[in-house]
Amino acid sequence: AGMRLGFAVANPELINSVFTVKNSFNHFPVDFLAQTAGKAACKNYSYYEENAKKIVNERILLTEFLRSKNWFVIESKTNFIFAKKDGMSGTSIYEAVKKEGILIRHFNTPGIEDFVRITIGTKEQMDKLKKVLVEI
């Protein structure tokens, strides 16, 4: 998450509107390293496509696992899931996995304070997380 590079696809009118106001909130700096990484990524599409498939697969497996353990999981099409376990606070889940060296996100925002956001990692990382979640 140290370097981010993105792109937008939109109606030309909308893109022009974004460029009209961009300097008032963000000038979209893209340094040389990000540009170089972006070029390399475009040249190796199959690598990223394969990684995306792995992330989707691990997300599905984690969602199914959590639901089988009576967690409420919001449907996701991203590289993370948003979930909660009845009877457990988001803080207690966060602290329990943190003790095992696993970092997830917890928000103290009213309405979502019992949810955690879990970023999908490698199979090994997700297996470790599942093991920890069963124990709490």
Task: For the regions a language model picked out, list residue spans one by one.
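Residue-level detector of flexible, active-site-proximal loop/helix-junction positions
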Residues: 25, 80, 111
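PLP-dependent aminotransferase class I/II
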Residues: 1-66, 71-74
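Short acidic/glycine-enriched loop/turn segments that link adjacent beta-strands
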Residues: 2, 77, 111-114
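Conserved PLP-binding catalytic core of the aspartate aminotransferase-like
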Residues: 55-56, 60, 64-100, 116
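Thr-Gly-centered strand-to-loop micro-motif
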Residues: 3, 83-84, 104-106
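PLP-dependent enzyme catalytic core of the Aspartate aminotransferase-like
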Residues: 96-100, 104-105, 109-136
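Short hydrophobic/aromatic beta-strand micro-patches
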Residues: 9, 82-84, 119-121
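Phosphate- and divalent-cation-binding pockets in alpha/beta enzyme and binding domains
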Residues: 17, 37, 84, 92, ...
